[in-house]
Design a protein with these regions (language model features):
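Conserved phosphate-binding catalytic cores of ATP/NTP-utilizing and phosphoryl-transfer enzymes
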Residues: 36-58, 163-186
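Conserved hydrophobic residue
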Residues: 3-4, 34
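Short coil turns linking two alpha-helices in DNA-binding domains
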Residues: 17-24
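Glycine-rich phosphate-binding loop and adjoining helix at the ATP-binding site
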Residues: 84-185
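A short alpha-helical element within helix-turn-helix/winged-helix DNA-binding domains
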Residues: 4-5, 9-14, 28
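Gly/Thr-rich phosphate-binding beta-strand-loop-beta motif of the actin/hexokinase/Hsp70
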Residues: 47-84, 187-189
Length: 189
């Protein structure tokens, strides 16, 4: 993995003096955004302290819009699930009322999840059918609007949204959160 940053490395990378970076990092530690991870062994000289983002500094939200349910999840930086809810009463229909329900369900989950909205860096939304993640459009559902599905949801929840096909999203999650990362070739069925 990548080396954890020390004060000297942070100062060099950010073109800031060591005293200034020390003050800034101390403020981030006080705000519980950064953790002091302790000293590391070096070939010689003083052992520097290294720093990393605190798990509670940033969160991610995920929503799977299935044909007959919706699943919502909040994770921290280490992919630990903080909260997960499944709504089995949801039924996907290609109607404006259903899009309104999707948006209000997501808003309610975000509001009730117990995490400060400002700490939720992004929202991944997966939906069945063909999706263009670059344009944020679904080719099967809610296609009558000039705005993409991603943009509609993003405006409603006020969090950056990534829209993806449900199978690709599950494959990516399986690859990213499991031992599959050690493999050079993976097939997802």
């Amino acid at each position: 993995g990548a080396a954890l940053p020390s004060m000297r490395l942070l100062a060099k990378e950010l073109h800031i003096s060591v005293p200034t970076i020390t003050k800034l990092v101390q403020e981030l530690i006080e705000e519980k955004i950064v953790n002091d991870l302790g000293k590391v062994e070096t070939p010689g000289g003083r052992r520097p302290n290294v720093f990393g983002l605190a798990n509670s500094a940033i969160y991610f939200a995920g929503v799977n819009v299935g044909r007959d349910n919706m699943t919502y999840v909040i994770t921290d930086l280490q992919n630990n699930i903080i909260k997960e809810v499944t709504d089995s009463s949801f039924e996907l229909q290609n109607r404006p009322q259903c899009l309104e329900k999707i948006c209000s369900n997501i808003e309610n989950f975000i509001n009730d999840c117990g995490i400060d909205r400002a700490k939720i860096l992004g929202l991944g939304v997966s939906i069945v059918g063909r999706v263009n993640p670059e344009t944020g459009r679904s080719y099967m559902y809610f296609t009558s609007s000039e705005e993409s599905l991603r943009d509609i949801i993003e405006k409603r929840v006020n969090i950056r949204v990534l829209l993806e096909n449900d199978t690709r999203a599950r494959c990516y999650a399986e690859y990213n959160c499991s031992r599959s990362k050690e493999e050079s070739n993976v097939i997802y069925l």
